[in-house]
């Protein structure tokens, strides 16, 4: 696995964890374990949906304050990963039970998991309707990013990537 691919997979891990109501605890051990689980899923989503490599930049820079994610394919990738992780119900809404269990399984306590669920639920309800599920997911992701930055919970991707690369 080359350094760029590893960096992209680590970024995907961080984003999926946060977007799918994962864990705001960005400890290297948690991130490394998640990377092993999500890297393959991202590759599967890219192949299944014929997604372009342009999503790499969005995943690598997602948490950078001021970076604007606007690529529809990124929304499609997030949606696909969320489905693979059973984080959304058949209507495309967050599956609260599965998301809560996922968050707690990866280190979030009850209060943190509930707060993250509330943020995503509020973002689902506050983003404008969109018949394009990928663009709707992208809007929810951007809302979530904004709220996480307000809480100062955004991960420092340079530190996370550095820790994971040291383990590879």
Swiss-Prot record:
Q: Fetch the InterPro entries from UniProt.
A: Odorant/phero-bd_Lep (IPR006072), PBP/GOBP (IPR006170), PBP_GOBP_sf (IPR036728)
Which chain regions cross the lipid bilayer? none
One GO term of the biological process aspect: response to pheromone
Alphabetical list of SMART domains matching this protein: PhBP
Q: Which GO terms describe its molecular function?
A: pheromone binding
Q: In which tissues is it expressed?
A: Antenna.
Q: Which residues form the signal peptide?
A: 1-26
Which of UniProt's keywords are assigned here?
Answer: Disulfide bond, Pheromone response, Pheromone-binding, Signal, Transport
Q: Name one Pfam family in it.
A: PBP_GOBP
Disulfide cysteine pairs (residue numbers):
45-80, 76-134, 123-143
Role, per record:
This major soluble protein in olfactory sensilla of male moths might serve to solubilize the extremely hydrophobic pheromone molecules and to transport pheromone through the aqueous lymph to receptors located on olfactory cilia. PBP is also found in sensilla from female M.sexta antennae.
Give the family per the record. Belongs to the PBP/GOBP family.
User: How is the quaternary structure described?
Assistant: Homodimer.
Protein name (record): Pheromone-binding protein
Q: What is the lineage of its organism?
A: Eukaryota, Metazoa, Ecdysozoa, Arthropoda, Hexapoda
């Amino acid at each position: 696995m080359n350094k760029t691919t590893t960096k992209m997979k680590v970024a995907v891990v961080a984003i999926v964890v946060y977007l799918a109501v994962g864990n705001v605890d960005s400890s290297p051990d948690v991130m490394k374990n998640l990377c092993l689980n999500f890297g393959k899923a991202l590759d599967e989503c890219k192949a299944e949906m014929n997604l372009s490599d342009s999503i790499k930049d969005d995943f690598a820079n997602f948490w950078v304050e001021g970076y604007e994610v606007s690529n529809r394919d990124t929304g499609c990738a997030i949606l696909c990963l969320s489905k693979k992780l059973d984080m959304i119900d058949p209507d495309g809404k967050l599956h609260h039970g599965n998301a809560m269990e996922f968050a707690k399984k990866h280190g979030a306590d009850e209060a943190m998991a509930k707060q993250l669920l509330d943020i995503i639920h509020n973002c689902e309800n506050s983003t404008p309707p969109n018949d394009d599920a990928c663009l709707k997911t992208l809007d929810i992701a951007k809302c979530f990013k904004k709220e996480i930055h307000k809480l100062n919970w955004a991960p420092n991707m340079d530190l996370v990537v550095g820790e994971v690369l040291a383990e590879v």
